[in-house]
Amino acid sequence: MKITKVAVAGTLESSDVQVRVQPFDSLDIEINSSVAKQFGEQIEATVREVLAKLGITAAQVIVEDKGALDCVLQARVKAAAMRATDEMINWEAVL
């Protein structure tokens, strides 16, 4: 999947995460979280895993974490990535 435009998913509410995805020449992940020292590596690993499953190798991803669970982070990354592409989505494969 190729990222062609800027897209955002999520909110800045407590227990949520806002993920911004935009075109970039390589894969760049920025994590802003009050729990980054404890969970920063896990957050980055989750983001990388979701992007790999979607076939994304070039994008800038900015994660503003407010204490979201892993499943919420996965959903937000997936939603932002799908909003940021012009490709047709195979919904049977995604769901």
From Swiss-Prot:
InterPro entries, per database record: CitD, Mal_deCO2ase/Cit_lyase_ACP
An example GO CC term for this entry is:
cytoplasm
Matching Pfam families: ACP
Q: Which keywords describe this protein according to UniProt?
A: Cytoplasm, Phosphoprotein
Q: What is its main location?
A: cytoplasm
**O-(phosphoribosyl dephospho-coenzyme A)serine modified-residue sites:** S14
Q: Where in or outside the cell is it found?
A: Cytoplasm
Which HAMAP family would you find in this protein's record? Answer: CitD
Instruction: Tell me the subunit arrangement.
Output: Oligomer with a subunit composition of (alpha,beta,gamma)6.
This protein is called what? Answer: Citrate lyase acyl carrier protein
Q: What gene is it encoded by?
A: citD
